[in-house]
């Protein structure tokens, strides 16, 4: 883009609303989601209470839905990385909840009040038995950043809302998984992708 507004484009609505984020390093959450015009005038901006990333969509109701980061403590799984974590004082026994896992939450904001009126968290619907064991995400240099430890567990990077099916689709990069979610119940209809220890993948695990 051009001009003094550092806008990142994600997608557009059927009504040709342009949706994305604006880069603003003065903010704690430096990529607030925005609905903007072709002239880069802001039509709507999410409240920036949480870190939004990768996708923002406008629903047929006029409300907005996006992907935000959420976290909770979880175990460090047993693996080739175990001894390295233990050297830094972690138990790293595969079951002690001692390490920050960063997951994702799908959030719907009211278009007028910007209040969260619906949400869905991976921590409520995915098993922490499932993680990327082959992509290097548990290697120590992937989880440590200037002494700030965190594990990028799910990394949801795409969101689609289907009014016809009353469903939300998400793509979860680090689990190699696509999930269909019933809206508004939040029930997982199916998971498609790599087979993992929980057995929660229903189809596509032989692709």
Can you name each region flagged by the protein language model?
Residues 1-207:
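Secretory-pathway ectodomains
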